[in-house]
Amino acid sequence: MHSMRLMAVAAIVALAACSSDKVTSLPAPVVPQATVLTVSGNIAAKVDEFRNLLGPANGGTAGEQTTGRREINWDGAGANPFDNKNDFPAGFFNSNVKAGAVFTTPGTGFRNDSTDFSEVNATYATQFNFFSANKIFAPVGSNQLDQLFQVAGQPTPALTRGFGIVFSDVDLADKTTIEAFAQDGSSLGVFSAPVRSDAGGLSFVGITFDNAIIARVRITLGTGVLGANVNDVSSGGTSDLVVLDNLIYGEPHKAL
């Protein structure tokens, strides 16, 4: 009987050892790979290429569309009452205009500007340029903003397959970026805008995925915050000041 107990104990120990030998770590999750388009200088052709990747323009049509894209250029008449102020509504582009976009910022607001921000700082008049005439955009009190996607005209979380931005006056490499996030909050990658390469000073970066998986993007504009006493590195300052123009993104589809 004693020997049988010893044999049983030995068998259990052997089984436990065998089981521990078979424990393996789970493979790291696979991050989907983006198709990335970048250009600086004469950006028009590359922007059109990106638009074509996403499909036809859906404008401000309310409701989820089967295919296509949305685009914000800041120039519509509906935004005029908010021009050159620091209180542009964060939800304007899903309430006033049904484009499926809502913005947040750690700063104090947003500014839609028709003066190249020269009313903020006179040196900006020659610093920034627009892509689509004539308004440009930036957060107030921060160089960072997030864009969240919703079904056009509805407060329903949505996902998009692609996102691109026109930037103005990128002076430093890898400081002006888009970071895309999935529905679970995981990062889908950080994508840098190229440095300006001509007097116009425009840069573009666009990303697309095979499927609609982007729930949010974080946009970082250079290294500094616009201000009356803050000059760009090209005007004797210490910060790379950047603003944005057109936002182009795939049709937001309801998140499941």
Task: Indicate residue ranges for each PLM-predicted region.
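Surface-exposed, well-ordered secondary-structure segments
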Residues: 26-256
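Residue-level detector of transmembrane insertion/anchoring sites
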Residues: 9-11, 65
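C-terminal motif of bacterial Sec signal peptides marking the signal peptidase cleavage site
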Residues: 14-17
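Bacterial N-terminal signal peptides that target proteins for export
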Residues: 1-8
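Bacterial lipoprotein signal-peptidase II cleavage site
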Residues: 19-26
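Generic short amphipathic/hydrophobic targeting helices enriched at N-termini
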Residues: 8-9, 210
